[in-house]
Structures are given as C-alpha cells and as structure tokens.
Amino acid sequence: VAPFPHGKLVTYKYIADVKAGVDPSLV
C-alpha cells in the first residue's frame, strides 16, 4: 500500500509513475 492518504486515484497514478520509471517522490 502506498504511504499517502490521497486516495485510490493518486495510488493508481503512483503505480503508473513507478512503472514508467518516474521517482514518485518527485511527483
């Protein structure tokens, strides 16, 4: 589970960013 409380839409974006090779800490 992603460690932030922004909800499922952001969680899916987080997963997509990780798959794209984007560091989620920069998003």
UniProtKB/Swiss-Prot annotation:
Keywords per UniProt:
Lipoprotein, Secreted
Summarize tissue expression: Hemolymph.
Where does the UniProt entry say this protein principally localizes?
secreted
* CC per GO annotation: extracellular region
Does Zinc show up as a keyword for this record? no
Please tell me whether the keyword Lipoprotein is annotated for this protein: yes
**Superkingdom of origin organism:** Eukaryota
Which cysteines are cross-linked by disulfides?
Answer: none
Give the subcellular location: Secreted, Extracellular space
Outline the subunit composition: Homodimer.
* Primary role: Unknown (it might play a role in lipid transport and/or storage protein metabolism during metamorphosis).
According to UniProt, the name of this protein is Larval-specific very high density lipoprotein
Natural source organism? Apis mellifera (Honeybee)
